[in-house]
Amino acid sequence: MNAPRSLDELINALRCLPGVGPRSAQRMAYHLLQRDQEGARRLADSLDYALEHVRHCEKCNNFTEEVVCELCSSQRRDPALLCVVEMPADLLMMEQAHCYKGMYFVLMGRLSPLDGIGPREINLDRLLKRARDNMVKEVILATNFTVEGEATAHYIGEMLQNEGLKITRIARGLPVGGELEHVDSGTLAQAVLERREVK
């Protein structure tokens, strides 16, 4: 016996989430339909609302409902510092560590040629434009210490080397292969304080 077409479509839709395979998607679909229909409605409404209202900030590329996000609009931030992170979760970790008061640029990924992710896919043209805005003096590369994160940091360092900017890399208080999202705020704060210049 085959499942109803609408149930199959829901299961396949849930598989687009990271780390969700066919069995997990099936369990989620059954749970939402059988045990938590109110939760399913909230999920559908929230997703619909987010798709309609959330966009990328014109300056930092982070998610926002405004043209320019709250961080980029703040007069309390230091516009001379620009911290480059891979994902919004990395920006959130930096903010929770209370170790940085400059501006950000969120790549929304990292270079991964095997996955078809090159400079265009992670908005390096927008990063270059932002770095050239005459306010930025230092670019802090806070990509993850994974192979792809290191390659991304190296590529950006090379791209910006002739722009008259100080280019630094967060210190390796973070474990090799580690991702910012999973690091405690104290370790992250120390890594930012001990950043080193990229040569």
Swiss-Prot record:
GO MF assignments: DNA binding; zinc ion binding
Keywords: DNA damage, DNA recombination, DNA repair, Metal-binding, Zinc, Zinc-finger
PROSITE patterns linked to this entry: RECR, TOPRIM
Toprim domain span: 80-175
Gene Ontology biological process terms, A to Z: DNA recombination; DNA repair
Record-annotated disulphide pairs: none
Family, similarity comment: Belongs to the RecR family.
HAMAP family (UniProt xref): RecR
Annotated function: May play a role in DNA repair. It seems to be involved in an RecBC-independent recombinational process of DNA repair. It may act with RecF and RecO.
Protein name: Recombination protein RecR
Source organism of this protein record: Nitrosospira multiformis (strain ATCC 25196 / NCIMB 11849 / C 71)
